[in-house]
Structures are given as structure tokens and as C-alpha cells.
Curated annotation (Swiss-Prot):
Name of the featured protein: Biotin/lipoyl attachment protein
Protein modification: Can be both biotinylated and lipoylated on Lys-35 upon overexpression in E.coli depending on the growth medium; the nature of the modification in situ in B.subtilis is unknown.
SUPFAM superfamilies named in the record: Single hybrid motif (SSF51230)
Top-level taxon in the UniProt lineage: Bacteria
Modified-residue entries (N6-lipoyllysine), positions: 35
Lineage summary: Bacteria, Bacillati, Bacillota, Bacilli, Bacillales
Residue positions, PTM N6-biotinyllysine: 35
Length: 73
């Protein structure tokens, strides 16, 4: 299970780390695109197994941000 990026831009802030429990609808990161801050929201619940991108990375639509385990949805 993964949480992916919805649009291209710079990954400005990541709010979670490996081992964190996240809930569906929780803001997990902020993307900066076209001088706007766009929240990245988890579309499922689970435990963060791995954060695949780091702050400052340029990301594309569809890139995997988080790998999750023990998803409850």
C-alpha cells in the first residue's frame, strides 16, 4: 500500500516518518507548485513503513511518497 503525489512540484515539508500511524484524510506532506502550497493527504490509513522522498525533492504526479504496512482500509 502506498500514498502517491497528486501533481508535480517541490516537496516542501514531510510531516511523517517511518513508524508513524496515519489516518485516511490526514495531511502527510506539503507540495510547492506554481508558488502555491498544496497539502498531500493520505487516501488510506496505516503505519508508515518507508518515506520514499525527502524534503526538497522534485516530484512528479504519481510518484510514491509513502509505503504503508498494516493498512486498516
Amino acid at each position: 500500500m502506498t500514498v502517491s503525489i497528486q501533481m508535480a512540484g517541490n516537496l516542501w515539508k514531510v510531516h511523517v516518518k517511518a513508524g508513524d500511524q496515519i489516518e485516511k484524510g490526514q495531511e502527510v506532506a506539503i507540495l510547492e507548485s506554481m508558488k502555491m502550497e498544496i497539502p498531500i493527504v493520505a487516501d488510506r490509513s496505516g503505519i508508515v513503513k518507508e518515506v520514499k522522498k525527502k524534503e526538497g525533492d522534485f516530484v512528479n504526479e504519481g510518484d510514491v511518497l509513502l509505503e504503508l504496512s498494516n493498512s486498516t482500509q
